[in-house]
């Protein structure tokens, strides 16, 4: 899944340098999320039994919420950065209080209590070595 335009650019560049042959499937590709935080998923590839691992949430998890909403799957988000942690905690807390979340960037979330409960947040990151990083 490609989380944003930067990842899409890297994917296109890598494919240009090292072309790969992609097999066609009977499934259509579905864009989930918004123009900044999105992922591309083959339709019918996920189910309620699926778990999606999402790395680098930042301050926009519309794609993660969209996956839960579209497929009913569980999503595990991994991002240890303080702003991302604060963003998720505020969204979760307000959602569980029955309130709508409006973040600093102007984005609004419409997420249900059941949807937010299907998202697990971990303050962990992928790194090239086993160490503690400061943000």
Predicted regions and their residues:
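Phosphate/nucleotide-binding beta-alpha loop and adjacent structural elements of enzyme active sites
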Residues: 1-135
């Amino acid at each position: 899944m490609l989380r944003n335009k930067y990842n899409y650019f890297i994917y296109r560049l890598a494919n240009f340098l090292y072309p790969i042959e992609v097999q066609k499937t009977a499934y259509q590709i579905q864009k989930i999320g918004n123009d900044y935080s999105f992922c591309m998923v083959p339709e019918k590839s996920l189910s309620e039994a699926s778990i999606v691992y999402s790395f680098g949430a930042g301050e926009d998890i519309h794609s993660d919420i969209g996956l839960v909403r579209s497929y009913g799957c569980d999503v595990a988000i991994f991002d240890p950065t303080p702003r991302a942690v604060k963003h998720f905690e505020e969204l979760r807390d307000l959602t569980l209080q029955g309130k709508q979340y409006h973040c600093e960037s102007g984005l609004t979330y419409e997420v249900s209590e059941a949807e937010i409960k299907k998202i697990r947040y971990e303050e962990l990151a992928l790194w090239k070595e086993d160490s503690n990083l400061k943000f």
